[in-house]
Amino acid sequence: MKIRLACLLLIVLNLILSSSENAGAKKLKFKACAKPLPLQLKPFTNQPQQIDYLCGNTGCFKNAANDKQNAQKNNLCAATEVITPVTLKTFSDLNHASNNEPSIPKGEPPASRAKLANIISLPQGKTLGEGKVVSFVGYVLDARHSNVDKDNPLTAGNGESVQCNLLGCAYNDIHITLAEDGNEKKLCNTIVAEIIPHYRPPAWDLFDSPDYAKFFKTHPVKITGQLFFDGSHVPCTAEGKAGNNPARDNAKDFERLALWEIHPIYAIEVCKFDDQTKCNSAKAWLPFSELKKWLGLSTVTPSDKCKATIDNPSSKCPGFKLPN
């Protein structure tokens, strides 16, 4: 009888402890895919970051069109069976097509993104557009955690709606400016790629480290990820000057060839050689996550504004509350 009672008490105690643990368990707000994450993100499928518990796929609500755009920015589910190599010419063609699509407004996310999906034709009856996976080989002209104040990264600035306007490097995109020529001086001949913070590998968080800057000046990179149309901006003019954004009182937008981006990034590779003609072999490429070891670096230093971090960040999103 005493043994039975002891067993019963043990079962009840386990149930109470289990219930308590479940009640205190953190709940993910960001929904990844029903399948493993793509390409180099695959090992991190079950390794969410702090932001994944704080901010969902659509970020901070502004309107329905912005929600759709934010969800597309955070799309980690695009099919990778077919990866299309692209060049600046491809981005120019995409830009021309979207500029001439009547359903796409200037400087604002479109209400429907359907026309973006197969917006240009490729040889052999194929098409290309938003949601397809592409790869681009070029040079990093600039890399930085965007929407992060350089002097007061955890308290100043507005963040970005796609990341619930959270403040700090851990909660924002890494904005990469890419060119086909490492000596390119005109930003209107560049494109943009973005590393999102959701499920971001720790090594990628240091992509904008000053320790890599010298290497990037001379070595090509290969960026693979989803093709995405950022309707919140305007591209450079045909004359190669910054465009004026009608949705922002005709203020000058930042310079880039097209509104089409590689966003989010699924894989980053670096060429071991500073001569691009030697980068044609698969053996010439190294996953970025292995660059630290390959360069013989014992440590990699974050950029100055990214040295401080916090688990309970501030947000400029109206009504945003940290989970209990």
Predicted regions span which residues?
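Positively charged n-region of N-terminal signal peptides that target proteins for export
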Residues: 1-5
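Bacterial N-terminal signal peptides
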Residues: 7-16
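Hydrophobic alpha-helical segments
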Residues: 16-18, 277
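Boundary at the C-terminal end of the N-terminal hydrophobic targeting segment
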Residues: 19, 23-25
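OB-fold and OB-like single-stranded nucleic-acid-recognition modules
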Residues: 26-324
